[in-house]
């Protein structure tokens, strides 16, 4: 039964995750943490941080880890297939439709109107993960880390992977001694 649940969870999340891997993360979170409890909020947050630091598409890394954690090697394969297949099929079908009707106000309206929904989904996920961080290390540490990260990415164009590594190091070397 776990195989069916894994397939459906990742198939639906990736089928509806318009905008790519990052847009499907809140949908995966809903399935993985809230619906099936395969991971806790903390486990999902840690996995997401590490997955962002590693090369490759985020959605496939999340599917691989969760699939393996919940269902071993068969779960790994099922979750990966469920992640890749809807995107590949949707890409083929939608690109043909969009290319054919690219000047249509309906197509333009559809692609533009979904963007605020994706933004809200990502904000909710950010809030949930941020709230856990605040509970774990407090407001001051969270604000300092957030501020430094924001500055490093916007002003200095630092790659997020370096910030994730720095946060891991800070969390392991400094926070335990505060």
From Swiss-Prot:
Location in the cell: Cell membrane
Transmembrane segments: 1-21, 47-67, 75-95, 117-137, 158-178
Topology with respect to the bilayer: Multi-pass membrane protein
Protein name per the record: Uncharacterized transporter YwrA
Organism ancestry: Bacteria, Bacillati, Bacillota, Bacilli, Bacillales
GO molecular function: chromate transmembrane transporter activity
PANTHER family linked to this entry: CHROMATE TRANSPORT PROTEIN-RELATED, CHROMATE TRANSPORTER
Domain of life of the native organism: Bacteria
UniProt entry keywords in alphabetical sequence: Cell membrane, Membrane, Transmembrane, Transmembrane helix
GO cellular component: plasma membrane
Source species: Bacillus subtilis (strain 168)
Major location category of this protein: membrane
UniProt similarity note: Belongs to the chromate ion transporter (CHR) (TC 2.A.51) family.
A Pfam family the protein falls into: Chromate_transp
């Amino acid at each position: 039964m776990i195989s069916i649940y894994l397939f459906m969870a990742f198939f639906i999340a990736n089928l509806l995750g318009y905008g790519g891997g990052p847009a499907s993360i809140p949908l995966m979170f809903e399935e993985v943490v809230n619906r099936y409890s395969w991971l806790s909020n903390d486990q999902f947050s840690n996995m997401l941080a590490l997955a962002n630091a590693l090369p490759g598409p985020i959605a496939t890394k999340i599917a691989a880890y969760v699939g393996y954690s919940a269902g071993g090697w068969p779960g790994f394969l099922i979750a990966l297939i469920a992640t890749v297949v809807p995107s590949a099929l949707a890409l083929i079908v939608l690109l043909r439709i969009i290319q054919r009707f690219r000047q249509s106000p309906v197509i333009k309206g559809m692609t533009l109107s979904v963007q605020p929904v994706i933004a809200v989904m990502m904000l909710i996920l950010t809030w949930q993960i941020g709230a856990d961080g605040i509970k774990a290390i407090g407001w001051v540490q969270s604000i300092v880390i957030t501020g430094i990260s924001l500055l490093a990415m916007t002003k200095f164009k630092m790659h997020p992977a370096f910030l994730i590594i720095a946060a891991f190091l800070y969390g392991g070397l400094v926070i335990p001694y505060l």
